[in-house]
Amino acid sequence: MTKLVRLKIKFLVSLLVALFLSGCVESQPSPDLFALPVTYIVGKKPEVVIARDMNNDEFPDLLVVNSAGNSLNYLEGIGDGTFKTPQTIETGREPFALDVADFNGDGIPDVALCNYGDGNVSIILGQKDGLFKLKTDVKVGRLPIAVAAGDFNNDGKTDLAVTLRFNKLIILLGVGDGTFKLAEAYQAGPTPAYIPI
């Protein structure tokens, strides 16, 4: 056996011993990247879920729109990635989309919810205790499919843009007390769906 072959064998034996011994050292357990899932029961045919801090406690809460259940679920965030039992708020027929903003200037988030089957938008006002009350329904036309909040006329009050299923965009100007007045109706392309603002 040549000297080079002996050196190679010694190196391989040393490497195998080192690998074997390194497996004997106690190591830290790998981190748990995902906890077991937690399931929450909501209404029939959930269409949309959004996360927003609805009660100003700095923890994200969940809002779930249930189109077949004609309801909105509110799940208050606890702050550890879990949520309290869902509260159910009755809506109009076939709620389909929503957006969150402060519509009455009280610093508490409110909800605008498209009721596809009723042709209106429900304005649901938030309260300090994290609960909600149905304030008003605003008729917008046939088959509202999307809603977005923003100050479109620069008056400091939150307005709404609503798309209707068949080629219309409706602008509702906020009065500042949680109510809205119809401002404009625009022709849109066929089947408008979403309004990014």
Task: Provide a role label for each language-model segment.
Residues 12-22:
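Bacterial N-terminal signal peptides
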Residues 24-44, 76-93, 125-142, 173-190:
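Blade-edge motifs of beta-propeller repeat domains
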Residues 50, 62-66, 111-114, 160-163:
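Hydrophobic beta-strand segments that make up the repeating blades of beta-propeller
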Residues 58-60, 107-109, 156-158:
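Glycine-aliphatic tripeptides that mark coil-to-beta-strand junctions in extracellular
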Residues 47-56, 76, 96-105, 125, ...:
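Beta-propeller blade termini
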Residues 71-74, 120-123, 168-172:
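A short loop-to-beta-strand structural motif that recurs across blades of beta-propeller domains
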